[in-house]
A protein has these predicted regions:
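Glycine-enriched, solvent-exposed interface loops adjoining structured elements
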Residues: 1-237
């Protein structure tokens, strides 16, 4: 488990330049460049895809009289939802899928009263078509926006703020990424280093996809009165 400063020092060795002493020393242009490149690297890896390290689960329960639920109020480290991982669990723990845009438009025009709960994701919010019953449990998976660990407390953070911060991502990937970015920033040829990084990135990301969570949002009937992707709930009297 290497800190961001240790990784940058290894990059400096590979680039045959002076090692940085303090990434947050604003009086050292060399150190400032390493910090800028490290931040760019971590931000880029966050945006690349749904890493297992960033995948988290969460839930909330509906409240009487409330139709909209901002996601960042449920999970402060929210970056984006994972596709096909939002489900409704009723009091009998039945699992069903979220409403599609086509279903939403149809229901807005031709809605008939019934025992159905339907919602969509809009502007970072869960928006229900009709006011849902109280205490309906919505579960979902999302990508966290955290990029580093605090070395002392192991707390996840979404900002690189200390020399001792530890990247959440694979340290070898981070080193390769910082290396080619540093070379590019300094006007040097970086094609070989960039290609090596891309190969390792795809290899690592592909391995993580092989162990990702199983999606339960299949099509078809999964239980009597519960239709996957049609968001139908039949409550027992």
């Amino acid at each position: 488990m290497k800190t961001i400063l240790e990784i940058c020092r290894e990059v400096a060795d590979l680039a045959a330049v002076k090692r940085p002493n303090d990434l947050f020393n604003s009086y050292s242009q060399q150190d400032s460049v390493f910090l800028s490149v490290a931040k760019s690297s971590l931000d880029s890896m966050l945006r690349y895809g749904n890493w297992q390290e960033l995948t988290k689960g969460a839930f909330f329960c509906t409240v009487e009289g409330k139709k909209q639920y901002p996601i960042d109020e449920i999970v402060p480290d929210f970056y984006c939802l994972l596709n096909n991982t939002v489900f409704v669990k009723d009091t009998h723990e039945r699992i069903i899928g979220a409403i599609t845009p086509e279903q939403w438009a149809r229901e807005k025009c031709f809605h008939c009263a019934g025992s159905e709960i339907k919602f969509k994701i809009q502007n970072g919010r869960f928006v229900f078509l009709e006011e849902p019953p109280c205490s309906v449990k919505i579960v979902f998976q999302y990508r966290s926006n955290n990029i580093v660990w605090d070395f002392n407390t192991f707390e996840e953070k979404n900002v690189l703020s200390a020399n001792t911060d530890v990247p959440i991502f694979d340290e070898y990937l981070v080193k390769l990424d910082i290396l080619w970015r540093w070379l590019k920033r300094n006007g040097m040829d970086y094609s070989e280093e960039y290609n090596e990084f891309q190969r390792e990135l795809k290899k690592k990301f592909g391995a993580e996809l092989a162990t990702r969570d199983i999606c339960l949002a299949g099509s078809g009937i999964v239980n009597e009165g519960v239709t996957a992707n049609e968001v139908k709930i039949c409550f027992k009297e």
